[in-house]
Amino acid sequence: MFDILMYLFENYVHSEVELLVDEDELTQELTRAGFHQSAIIKALSWLEHLASLQESDQPYLCNHDQHSFRIYTQAEMEKLDVECRGFLLFLEQIKVLNVELREMVIDRVMELDEPALILEDLKWVILMVLFNVPGNESAYEQMEDLIFEQPDGRLHS
């Protein structure tokens, strides 16, 4: 399923090509690209749920204290290792993510059918969430820079 999400993001969203609105056409396109029907359905459902989170009245998206500290469940810790959780905290500290966006990212991560995510995959999920939530263009650009920046190997400038 994650491969399909990446395919859609890279071929439609990130390349600024108009995304097919018709779900049947999109399903046919993904089938022609070699993806299995069951994975396509899961990926499209994942995207629909992402869109619905913006209008959600879920308490975890509405009621929060800016000074609170996120405690991860056992299932979340299994899916997001220490490096991934640390990266989420880092993004909050540099104001790329706020509490609501962090929770949207965690929600979307937990719905992926991957047993665990590596940091690079988490970065793409974050980028997808930021892209889909209006008003986060600056955070999206910062995240894009974090994904595509190439370290030059120097420790000091």
Swiss-Prot record:
Pfam families: DUF494. PANTHER family: PROTEIN SMG. Belongs to the Smg family. This is Protein Smg homolog.
